[in-house]
Swiss-Prot record:
HAMAP family the record matches: NrdR
Family the UniProt entry places it in: Belongs to the NrdR family.
Membrane-crossing residue ranges in chain numbering: none
NCBIfam families according to UniProt: transcriptional regulator NrdR
InterPro entries: ATP-cone_dom, NrdR-like_N, RNR_NrdR-like
Role of this protein: Negatively regulates transcription of bacterial ribonucleotide reductase nrd genes and operons by binding to NrdR-boxes.
Protein name (Swiss-Prot/TrEMBL): Transcriptional repressor NrdR
Amino acid sequence: MRCPYCQYEDTQVKDSRPVEEGAVIRRRRVCPVCGGRFTTFERVQLRELLVSKKSGRCEPFDRDKLMRSVEIAVRKRNIDPDYIERAISGIVRGLESLGEPEIASEKIGHLVMEALKSIDDIAYIRFASVYRDFRNASDFHDVIDELSKGIANTESCFDE
């Protein structure tokens, strides 16, 4: 693997261990040229997924982009990062197991909403405000009412 510091092509693995219940391999690497140390993670990717956007264009699925959007929703909440990582892995496995090469962005948003609903109400509301395109305070009030009644409707923008 290429060194992220000096771009040397052949770094050495110093330590490997399974994480996330064996679903991921964490590797500590060192560059023999500059001495830079860094960590890589190796995951199984069952298939290449494409995301069809609302605009009609398609782009490759980006796990890191999904992680960033969830991290924004859970920012400043006391949630274990490993728990979020497991939730993201579950969402990705769910997408891969659908067997569809192209997945609507709405479907991904729906799966994230379902995951966040079980993790943290505030994160759920934050994500919903973007996913459902909230326009005013009453939109927040509606989703809070749904949560308090235990009937959060994550399908308002998604038709299965």
